[in-house]
């Protein structure tokens, strides 16, 4: 490992497995961001972190967003991923500073795009998202957040306010040395197309979704 003065003006630790390649301005509909591009030499993935404003080291508003082509790009209502990404970018911009780490290689909770589509086909036949993965002989959740922790480390971030409903993300960051000062809910109103999926995330994957009961009553009425 070597130390360097990063683009943000902080001394950061450069780890050889995740290398910062480029920084560029990225104006968006939510506000002005900077895109920090990284290459993960261990996995061969290209990664990006969108940074808004001037970051401190502590309690940085942060979203770790697993890539979801169907939700983020196509507006799929099978999940709430696209709406969560938009909400996270908006909240970071409104807060004046923060980070959205967009995690490539996390498609379908880490099983890949084609496997995810196969799992979605099984869900259309009546299996839930957990049962579908297992029926395909795949892990329920294969995501690793080590690269996210190394990106935060490169940006000089030691603790975060984590926008997530998933306790496993918090646990993973803590294991990798990033303190989670607060877990900030990122709740999206469900629709008829994703209510079963969200219920499974709550009941089988331990996601914190306190708004779901009232929403389920509304959807079924």
Curated annotation (Swiss-Prot):
Q: Any note on cofactor binding?
A: Binds 1 zinc ion per subunit.
- What keywords tag this UniProt record? GTP-binding, Hydrolase, Metal-binding, Nucleotide-binding, Riboflavin biosynthesis, Zinc
Task: Identify the domain of life.
Answer: Bacteria
Q: Which residues are listed for Zn(2+) binding in this entry?
A: 68, 79, 81
Q: What is its EC number?
A: 3.5.4.25
The keyword tRNA-binding belongs to this UniProt entry's keyword annotation: no
Q: Which reaction does it catalyse?
A: GTP + 4 H2O = 2,5-diamino-6-hydroxy-4-(5-phosphoribosylamino)-pyrimidine + formate + 2 phosphate + 3 H(+)
- What family classification does the UniProt entry report for this protein? Belongs to the GTP cyclohydrolase II family.
Name by which UniProt lists this protein = GTP cyclohydrolase-2
Q: Record the organism.
A: Streptomyces coelicolor (strain ATCC BAA-471 / A3(2) / M145)
Q: Which gene encodes it?
A: ribA
């Amino acid at each position: 490992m070597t130390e360097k003065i990063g683009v943000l003006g902080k001394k950061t630790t450069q780890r050889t497995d995740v290398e910062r390649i480029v920084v560029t301005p990225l104006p968006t509909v939510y506000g002005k961001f900077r895109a920090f591009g990284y290459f993960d030499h261990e996995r061969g993935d290209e990664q990006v972190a969108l940074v808004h404003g001037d970051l401190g080291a502590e309690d940085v508003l942060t979203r770790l967003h697993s890539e979801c082509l169907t939700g983020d790009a196509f507006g799929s209502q099978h999940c709430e991923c696209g709406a969560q990404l938009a909400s996270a970018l908006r909240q970071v911009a409104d807060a004046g500073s923060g980070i959205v780490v967009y995690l490539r290689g996390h498609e379908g909770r880490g099983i890949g795009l084609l496997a995810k589509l196969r799992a979605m086909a099984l869900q259309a036949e009546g299996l839930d998202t957990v049962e579908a993965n297992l029926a395909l002989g795949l892990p329920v959740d294969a995501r690793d957040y080590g690269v996210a922790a190394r990106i935060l480390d490169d940006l000089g971030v030691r603790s975060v306010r984590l926008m997530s409903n998933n306790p496993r993300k918090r646990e993973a960051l803590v294991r990798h040395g990033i303190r989670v000062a607060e877990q900030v809910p990122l709740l999206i109103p469900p629709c008829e197309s994703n209510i079963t999926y969200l219920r499974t995330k709550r009941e089988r994957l331990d996601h914190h979704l306190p708004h779901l009961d009232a929403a389920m009553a509304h959807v079924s009425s």
